[in-house]
Amino acid sequence: MKDLRTLAAYALALLLLATFVSYSRSAPMGSFQRRNWTPQAMLYLKGTQGRRFVSEDRNEGDLYDTIRLESQSQNTENLSISKAAAFLLNVLQQARDEGEPY
């Protein structure tokens, strides 16, 4: 009975090893496979990163790869928390005063 378990364990290990080898041989060799992209796949690739062109040649660089979006304000003045809170309260009070009937 113990020999049967050992034989089954060896057979299972050999099967797993053969499966791993067969899958590793069928994996793509290059880092990027050339394929025909569908419109839905292109929209997925665009995503939130603003990608509008996926180059099939990796040596082209980032010339058309991404859109440069402004993400930071041009205002370089740093506001402290107290100034920001005072500004927010002022805006809220003005909005409340404008909403009251005369």
Curated annotation (Swiss-Prot):
Any one of the GO BP annotations: positive regulation of transcription by RNA polymerase II
Site feature (Cleavage) residues: R35, N36
Tissue specificity remark: Expressed in the anterior hypothalamus, ventromedial thalamic nucleus and medial longitudinal fasciculus of the brain (at protein level). Widely expressed. Expressed predominantly in the spleen, kidney, liver and testis. Expressed in olfactory bulb, pituitary, telencephalon, diencephalons, spinal cord, optic tectum, cerebellum and hypothalamus of the brain.
Family to which this protein belongs: Belongs to the spexin family.
GO CC term (a single one): extracellular space
UniProt KW keywords: Amidation, Cleavage on pair of basic residues, Cytoplasmic vesicle, Hormone, Secreted, Signal
Propeptide: 27-35, 50-102
Tagged with keyword Signal: yes
Note: Amidated and nonamidated form of Spexin-1 had similar effects on food intake/feeding behaviors.
Compartments, record wording: Secreted; Secreted, Extracellular space; Cytoplasmic vesicle, Secretory vesicle
Modified residues (Glutamine amide): Q49
Pfam families: Spexin
Protein name (database record): Spexin prohormone 1
Role noted for this protein: Plays a role in the regulation of food intake and body weight and in reproduction. May also play a role as a central modulator of cardiovascular and renal function and nociception.
GO MF term (any one): type 3 galanin receptor binding
InterPro entries in the cross-refs: Spexin
Induction: Up-regulated during female seasonal sexual maturation and after ovariectomy. Up-regulated by food intake in brain areas involved in appetit control.
Signal peptide bounds: 1-26
